[in-house]
Structures are given as structure tokens and as C-alpha cells.
Curated annotation (Swiss-Prot):
This is Argininosuccinate lyase. It is found in: Cytoplasm. Belongs to the lyase 1 family. Argininosuccinate lyase subfamily. Keywords: Amino-acid biosynthesis, Arginine biosynthesis, Cytoplasm, Lyase. GO terms for cellular component: cytosol.
């Protein structure tokens, strides 16, 4: 590393090569280059707007910065590790292009407020992209729900069959988890979209800058009212990684169900060849690698959140070099969430097929209608707890006899309690069990159809 550092005139000796490499961030903060250029263009225009530099100089700066953007997009600008970070790399290249005027760009600005601006612009953009991905994920869930209102699936508690539900109802649960994710990111976007530009190193600047003008150019909704907070705040990054962790929780839960449902033991879905892999030694295998990877990557995002929390907990005001470590955690968190949302959306849209015959068989081969027998008696005046205890005994007796509730004769029902009539068979039929749960938010078919309309409205309104 022989390049002269921007700050090196303060020092008599040169930086040890290993320390220079250790100190550099260009290998990962190059991710911010587009946002760094955008922020610098706004800063240059503000400097001219306030008379700190001339309009001609500002135009030279903007032209040079746009040239760097074009060079980067065309693969012609690839700063090496000797450049230390993306900010110095851009400034050095700008000076090469337009001469000494390029050295005026950093007037009234520190790397501290510069990187804070860059990372907010980056995250604002990424949040918008992720929210768009969430909408695509929700749409696929909604498409499946519309096709499976009256398809029944066992509902579980403690991973034991509990009550049958509409498959659409089950899928819409994930739709609403995703809706909360979408809304949560929108709230975080507001707190991210505040400009620290003009905070300087920590205390502001002596130049007559207009922070609100540059914020307006960058479409920020406001400016930090405290310069110390402006350069040292990373709440928005922590909030994002928290929201990202919740997105991953929801994707991981769905992934776990996909893994179970695709197993021979459940056999509720079939994985298509486009979204499954095989074994290197067992030729019969079709492995659910996509949901397994999503489930595995969830811990990775959790780790980034915890790492950033621990990073921040002991930092005094204002900027500290520790904050260089925020970027890799944030960048990888963003990349992981985007990749998992894309993979799950593809898996749902073209990677699975529901085995409706198997699902029908599943809801007809257990005692998940037992609660409805108790409800049947309670509706006819029998105290629910008494009815509950009675049905528990019936289930125990039926299990011992190798029978299901639907196999009992009417005489056997009446022996259990005289309130039973011939309509008990209809009451415990799986389709009726589901249809009868017509309370708001329940799995009844009428409620599910209304829930689908509500979900459509949510997607159309944003």
C-alpha cells in the first residue's frame, strides 16, 4: 500500500502495510458507492446554493461524480485495497478527473456525516426493495388461498392434530405475518430517512451550510437536530436487523412446515423438480434444500442483530472506528433476507403442489372433531366441562376399539348421552367442523372468503 493517505501529513511515518489492510473497508463499503456519489452530488449543489463554492465549481464536481458513476457501472472504476474506503477512493478519482476543484468537495463535511448519509440512503433503498418482495410473497400466498378455501388440512397444536382448518386459512396466517413485516419496515423507513449530512465530524461546521436544502435534494424527510447523535446513531440499522430477524422467523416457520409436509410421514405436498435436489448416494431422495437453507440462514440474521447490539452498547459519543463493523452485518443481513424472500416466493409459486386427496384422507382419519362433539352437547344444554369429560372417555374407548367417532352407531351415541341425535354425524364431518367455525377471524368458509377479500384490499391499497 504505497498510496498517500488523505490524512497522512499529520504523521511522520507511514502506516504499516498490515495495519493499513486491517484498517481498510473498501472491500465491503464499495457497496455504498452509488449512494456516496448521490450524497456527494447533493452536497456539492448545497455548497453552491449557499455560496461556499461557485456554481461553475459545483457543476464540475457534479460532472466528475457522474463520470465516476458511469465508470463504476461499466466496470472501469475498481478501487483497490490501497484506497482505504469508498469515500477516499471517490475523492481521489474525482481529483484525477477534474483537478484541484475535486478537493473542494469535502468542504463542510466529514467522513462521519458522509458515511452516515450513505448508509441511510442505502438502507432506505433496500427497505423499499424488500417491501416490494414481501408484496410478491403475499400475492403468491393469496393465490394459493383463493384456490384452497375448501381444501382441508389438519390443524396442529404441540405438533399433534388438533382441529381441521381450511388450507386457505392456514396460508393466510403467513400472509398476515408478512403484512406486519411490511408495515414494520415502513415505520423503520421513516426513522431511517433523516439526514445527518452537515453534522460534520461531531459538532457541526463553521460554514454557512443549509442542511435542509441538501436533505430535500436527497428526499430525506428531515435532518438530525443534534450533530452528535447524527454521526453516531445506528438505531435504524439495529431496527432493520430486528425487523429482518422477524421476517426470517416467519419464513423459517413456513420452511419448517414445508419440510414436514414434504416428508413421507406427512406427504401433504410434492416438491417439483425445479425446487428440489437429490442425494449423492441415495437415488430415491428428493431433498427440500430451499426451505432447509432458509431455516438455516435465519440464525445468520439473528447473529448480525446481536452483533450490532453488542457493538453499540459501549460506544461513547460520538463516532468511533468500531462503527466500521456495522456495514458487513447490515449488508449481509439485507442480502440474506432478500435472497430468502425470493427463494420462498419461487418455491410457493412453482415449487410445491398440494396433495388434496392425501389432505382429505388426513382430516378423516383422526379425532380432531372431538371438540365438536363437546360443542354439540353444550349447545343442547350440557355443561361444557361435563361434555368435555364425556367426550374424553368416548375417545379413549374408541381408540381401544380401533374406531373413529364417525364409526359409532347412533345407539352407541345415545348410550353415552340421550342428547345425541342423528345429526351428530353431520356435526362431526370435517367440512362441517370447519364451516361451523364462523366467528370473525375463524376458519369457517365464509370467514375465509371474507379474509381473502380483505387481503386483496391490503395488497391493492399499497
Amino acid at each position: 500500500m504505497t498510496e498517500k493517505k488523505t490524512w497522512s501529513d499529520r504523521f511522520e511515518g507511514s502506516l504499516h502495510p498490515a495495519i493499513a489492510y486491517f484498517n481498510a473497508s473498501i472491500e465491503f463499503d464499495i457497496e455504498l458507492i452509488e449512494y456516496d456519489l448521490t450524497g456527494s452530488i447533493a452536497h456539492a449543489k448545497m455548497l453552491a446554493h449557499t455560496g461556499i463554492i461557485s456554481e461553475t465549481e459545483a457543476q464540475q464536481l457534479v460532472t466528475g461524480l457522474e463520470q465516476i458513476r458511469a465508470e463504476y457501472r461499466e466496470g472501469q472504476f475498481n478501487p483497490g485495497i490501497d484506497q482505504e474506503d469508498v469515500h477516499f477512493a471517490v475523492e481521489r478519482r474525482l481529483t484525477e478527473i477534474i483537478g484541484d476543484v475535486g478537493k473542494k468537495l469535502h468542504t463542510a463535511r466529514s467522513r462521519n456525516d458522509q458515511v452516515g448519509t450513505d448508509i441511510r440512503l442505502y438502507l432506505r433503498d433496500q427497505i423499499d426493495q424488500i417491501r416490494g418482495q414481501i408484496r410478491e410473497f403475499q400475492q403468491v400466498l393469496l393465490d394459493h388461498a383463493q384456490n384452497h378455501v375448501e381444501t382441508l388440512i389438519p390443524g396442529y397444536t404441540h405438533l399433534q392434530r388438533a382441529q381441521p382448518v381450511s388450507l386457505a386459512h392456514h396460508l393466510l396466517a403467513y400472509f398476515h405475518m408478512a403484512q406486519r413485516d411490511w408495515e414494520r419496515l415502513g415505520e423503520i423507513r421513516k426513522r431511517t430517512n433523516i439526514s445527518p449530512l452537515g453534522s460534520g465530524a461531531l459538532a457541526g461546521t463553521t460554514f454557512p451550510i443549509d442542511r435542509h436544502y441538501s436533505a430535500q435534494l436527497l428526499q430525506f424527510e428531515g435532518v438530525y437536530p443534534n450533530s452528535l447523535d447524527g454521526v453516531s446513531d445506528r438505531d435504524f440499522a439495529i431496527e432493520f436487523l430486528n425487523a429482518a430477524s422477524l421476517i426470517m422467523v416467519h419464513l423459517s416457520r413456513l420452511s419448517e412446515e414445508m419440510i414436514l409436509w414434504s416428508s413421507q410421514e406427512f406427504s401433504f405436498i410434492t416438491l417439483t423438480d425445479s425446487c428440489a435436489t437429490g442425494s449423492s448416494i441415495m437415488p430415491q431422495k428428493k431433498n427440500p434444500d430451499v426451505p432447509e437453507l432458509i431455516r438455516g440462514k435465519t440464525g445468520r440474521v439473528f447473529g448480525h442483530l446481536q452483533g450490532l447490539l453488542v457493538l453499540m452498547k459501549g460506544l461513547p459519543l460520538a463516532y468511533n472506528k468500531d462503527l466500521q463493523e456495522d456495514k458487513e452485518a447490515l449488508f449481509d443481513g439485507v442480502k440474506t433476507v432478500k435472497g430468502c424472500l425470493e427463494a420462498m416466493t419461487i418455491l410457493l409459486s412453482e415449487g410445491i403442489k398440494f396433495k388434496t386427496e392425501r389432505l382429505t384422507q388426513a382430516v378423516n382419519e383422526d379425532f380432531s372433531n372431538a371438540t365438536d362433539v363437546a360443542d354439540y352437547l353444550a349447545a343442547r344444554g350440557v355443561p361444557f366441562r361435563e361434555a368435555y369429560n364425556l367426550v374424553g372417555k368416548v375417545v379413549k374407548t374408541s381408540l381401544a376399539a380401533g374406531k373413529l367417532l364417525k364409526d359409532l352407531t347412533l345407539d352407541q351415541w345415545k348410550e353415552l348421552h340421550p342428547a345425541f341425535e342423528a345429526d351428530i354425524y353431520e356435526a362431526i364431518a370435517p367440512s362441517q367442523v370447519v364451516a361451523a367455525r364462523n366467528s370473525y377471524g375463524g376458519t369457517g368458509f365464509k370467514q375465509v372468503r371474507q379474509a381473502i377479500l380483505t387481503a386483496k384490499t391490503l395488497l391493492e391499497s399499497n
